[in-house]
């Protein structure tokens, strides 16, 4: 528990020819294994990490995790958590990660896309998989993942494409001073020319940090390859 990154790092260092994939959860990767996790990213070890984030400890039966929402009720927080959650994307990019992507467990097409991109990446790749836990945290990502609302509450980023989203493809992301802003195309003189183009390969991590930090309801949640 928590040692997956240490083991996968050792395997890769011992046999660099191996294509190493690691599965871990929000609990073991960001709590008991957090030290191994951030230093593998910092060292840019050529491994592929899939972080399944269901915002709860599932294996150990329902304790709150580092990604549990503020106020979440669990076996170890019967009156609600008093801690604000980690954003895995911010953690990865803050540790100088060279690849970060995010997907939904229910979106097989997008998940396949980001895994293929991760496999091609030279260095440590981290994919955050937003998953449900039917037993201990059912509906963990319901507010953004349900098919009826997904198009308006998430944005799929692809390198070289404009940051446009919405069921009617009429919403976009613009720079607003030093931050980001959601706009409606066709209103207040806004056109597609005003919308940001995603550059996953930019050396400047600032925009990637802002994209990884976007949270509903103020912003759509960013999916796809954010940094590569």
What are these regions (language model features)?
Residues 17-32, 47-50:
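A short, small-residue-rich loop immediately preceding and capping a beta-strand
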Residues 25, 52-54, 228:
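Cofactor-binding loop segments of dinucleotide-utilizing enzymes, especially the Rossmann-like FAD-
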Residues 187-228:
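ATP/nucleoside-binding phosphotransfer catalytic cores, i.e., glycine-rich phosphate-binding loops
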Residues 1-6, 24-25, 58, 103-104:
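Active-site nucleophile and cofactor-binding loops and adjacent substrate-binding regions
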Residues 32-47, 52, 56-201:
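Glycine-rich ThDP/TPP pyrophosphate-binding loop and its adjacent helix/strand module
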Residues 18-20, 123-129, 223:
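Generic beta-sheet signal
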Residues 4, 12, 27-29, 33-35, ...:
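Gly/Ser/Thr-rich beta-alpha loop segments that engage phosphate groups in nucleotides
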Residues 1-21:
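Thiamine diphosphate
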């Amino acid at each position: 528990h928590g040692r997956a990154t240490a083991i996968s790092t050792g395997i890769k260092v011992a046999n660099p020819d191996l294509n190493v994939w690691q599965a871990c959860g929000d609990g073991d990767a960001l709590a008991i294994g957090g030290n191994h996790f951030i230093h593998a990213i910092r060292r840019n070890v050529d491994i592929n990490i899939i972080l399944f984030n269901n915002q709860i400890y599932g294996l150990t039966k329902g304790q709150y995790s580092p990604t549990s929402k503020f106020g979440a009720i669990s076996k170890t927080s019967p009156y609600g958590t008093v801690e604000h959650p980690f954003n895995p994307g911010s953690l990865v990019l803050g540790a100088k990660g060279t690849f970060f992507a995010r997907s939904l467990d229910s979106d097989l097409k997008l998940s396949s896309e980001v895994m293929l991109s991760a496999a091609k990446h030279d260095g440590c790749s981290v994919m955050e998989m937003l998953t449900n836990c039917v037993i201990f945290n059912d509906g963990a990502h319901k507010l953004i993942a349900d098919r009826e609302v997904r198009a308006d509450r998430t944005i799929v980023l692809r390198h070289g494409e404009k940051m446009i989203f919405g069921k009617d493809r009429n919403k976009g992301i613009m720079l607003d001073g030093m931050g980001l802003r959601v706009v409606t195309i066709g209103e207040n003189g806004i056109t597609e020319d005003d919308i940001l183009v995603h550059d996953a390969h930019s050396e400047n991590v600032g925009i990637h940090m802002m994209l990884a930090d976007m949270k509903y309801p103020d912003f759509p949640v960013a999916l796809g390859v954010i940094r590569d």
